[in-house]
């Protein structure tokens, strides 16, 4: 703490990111990165940007990427916002759309950055308890609010809210912005982007860090009504007009255009997930239904924190959350078959 800090800084509780170990020998199953590399076509496109044009600023609007996203989802570029990772996109959403008199609503078990943003921007919030199956109860969100946000599939549980239920939540909150955080949607869910033309209060966020294997590039997006997008553009241009570099814009656009590679890698992750679920269940683990590139599991005879520590000693890193209701679960990223086997060997 320093006497030069602004007063609010001392009360901030920052987000704690997953460990990025320096040792290459570790099997990394803790931060939900894709075990398969980016699209070769995207890599080639990015290499093409590494030239003298780097002396020039990138397109502040990211139009090439917006067009690719719009074509992929059947929307217009005016309905698309792009930013430096979905975390930055979410930060702009909290800043630009959730600062109202009523509290913001989100699940008690969800992305741990949400309360951090609320603290940063002075937003009142209420964490609404998921049911015993870790699902949202629509009735719990039928009350005054400044907005609603939730991850779908949920993080860290991996549980999916069906699109019909998402629409029911939208219908019950026509006077509030509803943000569906779809970081993991491509691994088993149906995107809510199909609803944006019917609901002017819907905003859907996605990332290229998971299903498109570009976590190191930092690219995120939002799709919604042009009026909501305009609010984000105003915040962005009051903060950083150039959030995406030249290589990121082109590489992310090509990642959307290369559908064949995208579908192939998603299928491999999904297939590996289903195999690993069965293998863990055979070892006595309870595994929650997952539509993500990770699973949430617990063993009735093993303390989760101790198990995570023992796995790390054997070179396998998984994620353990010390918080109510889920302290006995481990979140395990789906790796290649070889990485998953290393986990199973360590458990044995």
UniProtKB/Swiss-Prot annotation:
EC assignment: 2.6.1.9
Entry keyword annotation includes ATP-binding: no
Keyword Transit peptide tagged: no
Keywords: Amino-acid biosynthesis, Aminotransferase, Histidine biosynthesis, Pyridoxal phosphate, Transferase
Major enzyme class: transferase
Catalyses which reaction(s): L-histidinol phosphate + 2-oxoglutarate = 3-(imidazol-4-yl)-2-oxopropyl phosphate + L-glutamate
One Pfam family named in its UniProt record: Aminotran_1_2
CDD domains, per the entry: AAT_like
InterPro entries, A to Z: Aminotrans_II_pyridoxalP_BS, Aminotransferase_I/II_large, HisP_aminotrans, HistidinolP_aminotransfase, PyrdxlP-dep_Trfase, PyrdxlP-dep_Trfase_major, PyrdxlP-dep_Trfase_small
Top-level taxon: Bacteria
Chain positions with N6-(pyridoxal phosphate)lysine modification: 210
Coiled coil: none
Cofactor annotation: pyridoxal 5'-phosphate
Gene3D superfamilies (UniProt xref): Aspartate Aminotransferase, domain 1, Type I PLP-dependent aspartate aminotransferase-like (Major domain)
UniProt pathway: Amino-acid biosynthesis; L-histidine biosynthesis; L-histidine from 5-phospho-alpha-D-ribose 1-diphosphate: step 7/9
GO molecular function annotations of the record: histidinol-phosphate transaminase activity; pyridoxal phosphate binding
GO biological process terms on file: L-histidine biosynthetic process
NCBIfam families linked: hisC (TIGR01141)
Entry's family note: Belongs to the class-II pyridoxal-phosphate-dependent aminotransferase family. Histidinol-phosphate aminotransferase subfamily.
Self-association and partners: Homodimer.
Designated name of the protein: Histidinol-phosphate aminotransferase
Gene (name only): hisC
């Amino acid at each position: 703490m320093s006497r030069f800090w602004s007063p609010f800084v001392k009360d901030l509780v920052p987000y704690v990111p997953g460990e990025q170990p320096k040792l290459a020998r570790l099997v990394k199953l803790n931060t939900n990165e894709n075990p398969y590399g980016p699209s070769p076509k995207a890599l080639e496109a990015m290499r093409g940007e590494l030239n003298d044009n780097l002396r020039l600023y990138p397109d502040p609007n990211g139009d090439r990427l917006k067009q690719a996203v719009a074509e992929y989802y059947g929307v217009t570029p005016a309905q698309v916002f792009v930013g430096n990772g979905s975390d930055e996109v979410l930060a702009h959403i909290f800043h630009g759309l959730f600062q109202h008199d009523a509290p913001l609503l989100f699940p008690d078990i969800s992305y741990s950055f949400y309360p951090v943003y609320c603290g940063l921007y002075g937003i009142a919030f209420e964490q609404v308890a998921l049911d015993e199956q870790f699902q949202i109860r629509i009735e719990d969100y039928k009350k005054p609010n400044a907005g609603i946000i939730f991850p779908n599939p949920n993080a860290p549980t991996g549980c999916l809210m069906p699109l019909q239920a998402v629409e029911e939540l939208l219908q019950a909150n026509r006077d509030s912005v509803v943000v569906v955080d779809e970081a993991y949607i491509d691994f088993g869910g149906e995107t809510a982007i199909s609803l944006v033309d019917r609901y002017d209060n819907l905003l859907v966020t996605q990332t290229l860090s998971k299903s498109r294997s570009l976590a190191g590039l930092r690219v995120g997006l939002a799709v919604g009504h042009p009026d909501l997008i305009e609010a984000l553009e105003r915040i962005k241009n009051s903060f950083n007009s150039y959030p995406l570099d030249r290589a990121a814009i082109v590489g992310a656009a090509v990642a959307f255009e290369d559908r064949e590679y995208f579908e192939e890698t998603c299928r491999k992750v999904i297939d590996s997930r289903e195999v690993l679920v069965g293998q863990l269940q055979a070892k006595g683990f309870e595994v929650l239904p997952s539509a993500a590139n990770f699973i949430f599991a617990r063993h009735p005879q093993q303390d989760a924190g101790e198990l995570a520590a023992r796995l790390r000693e054997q070179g396998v890193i998984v994620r353990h959350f010390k918080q109510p209701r889920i302290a006995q679960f481990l979140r395990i990223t789906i790796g290649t078959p070889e990485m998953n086997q290393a986990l199973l060997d360590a458990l044995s």
